[in-house]
UniProtKB/Swiss-Prot annotation:
Compartments, as annotated in UniProt: Secreted, Cell wall
Role summary: Is a major protein component of the cell wall. May play a key role in the organization of the cell wall and in promoting the survival of this parasite.
Keyword match Cell wall biogenesis/degradation: yes
Name used for this protein in its record: Wall protein 1
Keywords recorded for this protein, A-Z: Cell wall, Cell wall biogenesis/degradation, Secreted
Species in which this protein is naturally found: Perkinsus olseni
Keyword Cell wall biogenesis/degradation on entry: yes
């Protein structure tokens, strides 16, 4: 998967 920067 691609890392968008959304780290809940």
């Amino acid at each position: 998967m691609e890392d968008e920067g959304a780290g809940g």
